[in-house]
From Swiss-Prot:
Its cofactor is heme. One of its GO terms (biological process) is isoflavonoid biosynthetic process. Changing residue 310 to A/V: Decreased intramolecular 1,2-aryl migration and increased production of 3-hydroxyflavanone and flavone. The keyword Nucleotide-binding does not apply. This is 2-hydroxyisoflavanone synthase. GO terms for molecular function: 2-hydroxyisoflavanone synthase activity; heme binding; iron ion binding; oxidoreductase activity, acting on paired donors, with incorporation or reduction of molecular oxygen, NAD(P)H as one donor, and incorporation of one atom of oxygen. The lineage of its organism: Eukaryota, Viridiplantae, Streptophyta, Embryophyta, Tracheophyta. Changing residue 371 to V: Total loss of catalytic activity. 5% activity and production of mainly 3-hydroxyflavanone. 0.1% activity and production of only flavone. Keywords: Endoplasmic reticulum, Heme, Iron, Membrane, Metal-binding, Microsome, Monooxygenase, NADP, Oxidoreductase, Transmembrane, Transmembrane helix. Its main location: membrane.
Length: 523
């Protein structure tokens, strides 16, 4: 008893002794100012009334002109900090990420429709580390990705065959729609082993992920769950959950039959499916962290949200820029002809030998990042650039603004892929897309960077190269007629979404480069 009392008193004394040290950081931060902020801050809505542009990144640019590259707002009752330079990005996402900015902000739609288990959104901790390791080591490792290369090639050839049919019939093709089908089918087959059943409902999920509600930012409304937004979340969930449940059960039946055949794979059966790996982990009783069915469902949604809309939208932007910049289109075609030739279809393995194609991908992401505003959440009060960043604050990184800033890019409004090839001795590797160059962060940076960056960029580059190799694209105007001469331009107007797509679908009549083109992808 005396020993226990002595230990208790010792712990109390030690805490009292260390308390000034433990709280010194917090106390010192109290003397620091908050980042500049507009006045006044209105009741309930905070500064939401200042977001008066159709798209968030434009409103944030206007505010940064008045309040500087680092400023604070209130989105309803939520403190929000906006950063607009690569130097600030580095402080948040590298210097202080581990201690304060390792978690993302999620809306009520994302939380519900990922079963509160999105690896992209869950707090940094043991579960996140385990799942992230599983994704990198077991799903997106080089061996698995290479085994799935024929599948990805099949999906690209499907797109090319549709384009060839349009070219032959002279019927305009909704290229935007075909790109969404391509990415959705590719991810669905890799993730689930099938392409069709989940496609339509997945689009509804992605659409609402790109929306916000006042209930996400005004705390008295969060528990009420009123309005159409919350009803739509419930409706989508009630339609999506039975579909993904059926897909999982179907996969479990396939696995059961395969075990009865001692692991033998039937002819025509897909041998590598990400869902199989997740089910293997879920059924393994020796795993330190048990994966539940809800967590598997959340990961399925993660893969769709990360790999379908963003890649399709980026590819749509790239094709539109190529149409509007025929010099770039022709230069890319000359590179493909020189490296690949005209007798076979360009392949994913060729991309490493096509630096100009890779630079087109980078230039597209510079001008049209899939996430123009990257979001994080502050989990611990922190000092950044002489200002205090409060715990719980939403952090916004205006990636779009940096991509158009003349301070960091020469002639930033021009689509000029050559900029990535002008560093002598480094080539297009001088600036990469993996979060180490803070003036170009289309996939984020640090621990929360998109793990599928290599897969996404390789797929996008391969499809672009395939289209350039095989077709010219004649733009169809609103009246359904092919545009000629100076009028043959694609509108680059943006609209809101999970990513920021073009406001109008890309409608074209493909023109086969030669009569031999269909033979390149007929098999």
């Amino acid at each position: 008893m005396l020993v226990e009392l002595a230990i208790t008193l010792l712990v109390i004394a030690l805490f009292i002794h260390l308390r000034p040290t433990l709280s010194a950081k917090s106390k010192s931060l109290r003397h620091l100012p908050n980042p500049p902020s507009p006045k006044p801050r209105l009741p309930f809505v905070g500064h939401l009334h200042l977001l008066d542009k159709p798209l968030l990144h434009y409103s944030l640019i206007d505010l940064s002109k008045r309040y500087g590259p680092l400023y604070s707002l209130y989105f309803g009752s939520m403190p929000t900090v906006v950063a607009s330079t690569p130097e600030l990005f580095k402080l948040f996402l590298q210097t202080h990420e581990a201690s304060s900015f390792n978690t993302r902000f999620q809306t009520s739609a994302i939380r519900r429709l990922t079963y509160d288990n999105s690896v992209a959104m869950v707090p940094f901790g043991p579960y996140w580390k385990f799942i992230r390791k599983l994704i990198m080591n077991d799903l997106l490792n080089a061996t698995t990705v290479n085994k799935l290369r024929p599948l990805r090639s099949q999906e690209i050839r499907k797109v090319l065959r549709v384009m060839a049919q349009s070219a032959e019939s002279q019927v305009p093709l909704n290229v935007t729609e075909e790109l969404l089908k391509w990415t959705n089918s590719t991810i669905s087959r890799m993730m689930l082993g099938e392409a069709e059943e989940i496609r339509d409902i997945a689009r509804d999920v992605l659409k609402i992920f790109g929306e916000y509600s006042l209930t996400d930012f005004i705390w008295p409304l969060k528990k009420l769950k009123v309005g159409q937004y919350e009803k739509r979340i419930d409706d989508i969930f009630n339609r999506f959950d039975p579909v993904i449940e059926r897909v999982i059960k179907k996969r479990q039946e396939i696995r059961k039959k395969r075990k009865e055949r001692n692991g033998e794979i039937e002819e025509g059966e897909q041998s590598v499916v990400f869902l199989d790996t997740l089910l293997d982990f879920a059924e393994d009783e020796t795993m330190e962290i048990k994966i539940t069915k809800e967590q598997i469902k959340g990961l399925v949604v993660d893969f769709f949200s990360a790999g379908t809309d963003s890649t399709a939208v980026a590819t749509d932007w790239a094709l539109s820029e190529l149409i509007n910049n025929p010099r770039v289109f022709q230069k890319a075609r000359e590179e493909i002809d020189a490296v690949v030739g005209k007798d076979r279809l360009v392949d994913e393995a060729d991309v490493q030998n096509l630096p100009y194609i890779r630079s087109i991908v980078k230039e597209t992401f510079r001008m049209h990042p899939p996430l123009p505003v990257v979001k994080r959440k502050c989990v611990q009060e922190c000092e950044v650039d002489g200002y205090v960043i409060p715990e719980g604050a939403l952090i916004l990184f205006n990636v779009w603004a940096v991509g158009r800033d003349p301070k960091y890019w020469d002639r930033p409004t021009e689509f000029r892929p050559e900029r990535f090839l002008e560093n002598v001795g480094e080539g297009d590797q001088a600036v990469d897309l993996r979060g180490q160059h803070f003036q170009l962060l289309p996939f984020g940076s640090g621990r929360r960077m998109c793990p599928g960056v290599n897969l996404a960029t390789a797929g996008m580059a391969t499809l672009l190269a395939s289209v350039i190799q095989c077709f010219d694209l004649s733009v169809v105007g609103p009246q359904g007629k092919i545009l000629k001469g100076n009028d043959a331009k694609v509108s680059m107007e943006e609209r809101a979404g999970l990513t920021v797509p073009r406001a109008h679908n890309l409608i074209c009549v493909p023109v086969a480069r030669s009569s031999a083109v269909p033979k390149l992808f007929s098999s």
